Amino acid sequence: MADVKELKQVLTGPIINNNPIALQILGVCSALAVTSKMETALVMSLALTVVTAFSNLFISLIRNHIPSSVRIIVQMTIIASLVIVVDQVLQAYAYEIAKQLSVFVGLIITNCIVMGRAEAYAMKTPPMMSFMDGIGNGLGYGAILLGVGFFRELFGNGSLFGIEILSKISDGGWYQPNGLLLLPPSAFFLIGGLIWVIRTYKPEQVEAKG
């Protein structure tokens, strides 16, 4: 049984020290697509966190009974089932957001973070640790998405969660929105900036030269 200190380390480690996007460079595609608004970034973060946490838990529970030759198929079946449940819940209770997220919720099935944690961690670790690892990696993923979404929505549209923060010129205000920030490639530059900030704060994360 893992102690509280171990669980805390597993939960908080992926947020900064081993962030799946900033350090491992995983899950970048969805970070480009769903961060033009804070609302979609938050919902996508929650969806991935739920899928990663529970797929880790279920895979860990049966890890000793999965034949090595079919382990990837079993992992993908569990992940796909959870993604379907999450997608149906979103369509039932948050239909407008589900439409905005479009296919990207379904693509969680192939997200490198989810598959990577299932194979590299849940297959070798007890259930509680695996569950907390899934939550931690989901929070780390969400932290980057929300950081990128904050800058893109605020400076690209003058709002946060759809609420006007910077009064736009078109509405008689003073702020001219930067439309470039609403284009998916802008997320590349923002993610790069966040990685630079994190690695300035944590120089041990910088790759060795030569």
From Swiss-Prot:
The chain crosses the membrane at residues 14-34, 42-62, 72-92, 96-116, 131-151, 178-198. GO terms for biological process: sodium ion transport. It is a multi-pass membrane protein. Pfam families: Rnf-Nqr. It catalyses: a ubiquinone + n Na(+)(in) + NADH + H(+) = a ubiquinol + n Na(+)(out) + NAD(+). It is found in: Cell inner membrane. Keywords: Cell inner membrane, Cell membrane, Ion transport, Membrane, NAD, Sodium, Sodium transport, Translocase, Transmembrane, Transmembrane helix, Transport, Ubiquinone. NCBIfam families: nqrD (TIGR01939), PRK09292.1 (NF006777), PRK12405.1 (NF009070). Composed of six subunits; NqrA, NqrB, NqrC, NqrD, NqrE and NqrF. This is Na(+)-translocating NADH-quinone reductase subunit D. It comes from Shewanella denitrificans (strain OS217 / ATCC BAA-1090 / DSM 15013).
